[in-house]
């Protein structure tokens, strides 16, 4: 079955993991789909050499169609796996096309929106660490790659129609770097951070004391109490959000609240 994937032009790729942290959790299943072969599920617990087995596929020039590719790539990079070829991220494509609209971009949302199919996600949070997976889990995992290529076809046409292919390519090309950056993280001086947080806490306490001295014993985190207390000292406001308070920032007590 795997040999047919090595000559495919496009491959749907997904993984099921035991959790969300590539440093602590493991890949349990890898799922593949293509136009000309049945979906392929690879049990990483049962096949110890799955990385070597799939290396030719990872290195192939086939377009890798992945939903939220950054997640998969972080797990792969942690294991020393480099994915070659173009990545088409269905989640990023959907987000680009929906810019300005309050739409959801989970895989099930896209499948329903573009393919009019409702996915069963009941196994999404099930136990993927058990030695024997249930048939319902395997069906769920297969379903996750079943619709990637049909989505790719729909989204690619939408991107072309909206003249967004170049910006989409730019987004897809950055996924590798973003995944590597998030996986690597950055160094942090914990001692200096703790010192800074203590300074902020002291400043916050000082400002709160000054506000209470001006307005009386109130909960400064309560917009209702704050508005009433300001009214009592002659400061009439429509609300206590930052936009309204900024209009009166010249007043010392309001300045302290903003700080």
Residue spans of the language-model regions?
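N-terminal accessory regions of nucleic-acid-interacting proteins
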Residues: 1-15
């Amino acid at each position: 079955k795997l040999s047919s994937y090595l000559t495919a032009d496009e491959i749907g790729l997904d993984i099921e993991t035991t959790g969300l942290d590539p440093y602590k959790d493991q890949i349990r299943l890898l799922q593949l789909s293509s136009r000309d072969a049945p979906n392929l599920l690879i049990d990483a617990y049962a096949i110890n050499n799955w990385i070597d087995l799939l290396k030719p596929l990872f290195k192939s020039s086939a377009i890798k169609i992945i939903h939220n590719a950054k997640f998969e790539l972080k797990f792969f990079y942690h294991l020393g796996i480099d994915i070659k070829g173009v990545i088409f991220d269905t989640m990023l494509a959907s987000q680009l096309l929906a810019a300005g609209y309050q739409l959801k971009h989970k895989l099930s949302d896209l499948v329903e929106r573009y393919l009019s199919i409702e996915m069963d996600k009941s196994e999404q949070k099930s136990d993927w660490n058990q030695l024997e997976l249930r048939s319902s889990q395997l069906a769920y995992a297969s379903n996750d790659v079943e619709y990637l290529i049909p989505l790719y076809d729909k989204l690619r046409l939408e991107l072309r129609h909206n003249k967004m292919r170049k910006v989409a390519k730019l987004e897809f090309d950055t996924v590798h770097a973003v995944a590597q950056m998030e996986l690597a993280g950055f160094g942090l001086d914990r001692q200096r951070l703790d010192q800074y947080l203590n300074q902020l806490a002291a400043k916050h306490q000082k400002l709160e004391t000054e506000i209470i001295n001006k307005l009386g014993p109130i909960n400064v985190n309560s917009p209702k109490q704050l508005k009433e207390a300001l009214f009592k000292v002659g400061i009439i406001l429509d609300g206590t959000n930052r936009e309204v308070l900024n209009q009166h920032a010249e007043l010392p007590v309001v300045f302290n609240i903003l700080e």
